[in-house]
Amino acid sequence: MINVLAVAGLPGSGKTTVARIIERRGYLYYSLGDVVRAEAERRGLTPDKTAVTMRLERGRKAVIYELLKSVKPGEKVVIDGIRSIEEVEALEEFLGTVFLIYVVASRKVRYQRLTGRGRSDDPLSFSQFLLRDLRELRFGLADLLSRADYIIVNETKSIEELEQEIGKVLLELR
């Protein structure tokens, strides 16, 4: 059985929704975005600047190493917001085999979701949205698509449809 599930995808693709569904199936939930937002608050910076700064100061694995301080080997965990192959490698190094789920949705759908959720790090304009995508891709997010063990196309799926799909995936992992 695989105990470590990682969820990746561009902002607004539905990563957190997928990860929270997995959490309800008995996995402990951890968010790399929460790590960055907490560090941003501590530093008095925006989450975007903090994500870049952490990686520049301490390398591409900086955020995942911070998160790993809270995770115990052997726990069933879902990690929300993986950004690079290096982060997956760090998880594998400390926790064992990782099953990577990549969530995709169109730009239009993702932008609509982001502008409707009201988080402090959400874009205020379409140009900010595009810049955020570019930053995420520079972290190595695009490379994860070829490493994904499972891809969810989350364009118009209801929560119930996502729950059914994820339930089938988790059954196969047993």
UniProtKB/Swiss-Prot annotation:
The keyword Repressor is assigned to this record: no
Pfam family, one: AAA_17
Chain ranges passing through the membrane: none
GO molecular function: ATP binding
Matching InterPro entries: NTP_hydrolase-rel (IPR022970), P-loop_NTPase (IPR027417)
Binding site for ATP: G9, L10, P11, G12, S13, G14, K15, T16
Assigned keywords, A-Z: ATP-binding, Nucleotide-binding
Gene3D superfamilies: P-loop containing nucleotide triphosphate hydrolases
Family membership: Belongs to the UPF0200 family.
Name of the protein this chain belongs to: UPF0200 protein PAE1629
